Amino acid sequence: VKSLAERAETELGGVDILVNNAGITKDGLFVRMSDADWDAVLEVDLTSVFRLTRELTHPMMRRRFGRIINITSIVGVTGNPGQANYCAAKAGMIGLSKSLAQEIASRNITVNCIAPGFIESAMTDKLNDKQKETIMGAIPMRRMGTGAEVAASALFLASNEAAYVTGQTIHVNGGMAMI
């Protein structure tokens, strides 16, 4: 991670906008979840965010500008049966973002989260028709979101129009959870 940050600095002139969007799931009932499944999800979904953000924050602080956008999940706020590891990682990302936002806001660096609900993706393509029907029934807009809708939120948070927005979580979920 350190060499990646150094290369970005020397070859690209630095990173002004960081979008942390890595994530995996290894779902299972809490009482049956293995340490390996717990650790794997937290490593990818939370620890990698910590490590990469830590390395890229120092140069942003020197430049006195940056936008850090963490893609979390609605289940990081609401919880979800069978996803204790994923929910814990995504909730941790929200807490990390709020803490970091308070630490570095004075350096003109914003830190925010986007919490998508059900978005058309390879993950939701795996759901059967009955599961999709149940999900749609819980979403007031009666459809899944699109990657473009999530990207539009990221574009806003990266823009000058969001210069006074920090420590926030934008929920992109069609009204599924009105928080």
For the regions a language model picked out, list residue spans one by one:
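Short, small/polar-rich loop/turn modules that mediate ligand/substrate recognition or access, typified
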Residues: 19, 105, 110, 165-167, ...
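Substrate-binding pocket helix/loop in short-chain dehydrogenase/reductase
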Residues: 29-30, 37-42, 124, 135
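Active-site helix of classical SDR
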Residues: 53, 89, 97
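Alpha-helical segment proximal to the catalytic Tyr-Lys
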Residues: 58, 102-106, 163
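Residue(s) in the substrate-gating loop at a strand-loop-helix junction
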Residues: 73
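Short C-terminal tail/terminal secondary-structure segment
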Residues: 78-81, 155, 166-179
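A conserved structural motif in NAD(P)-dependent oxidoreductases
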Residues: 139-150, 161
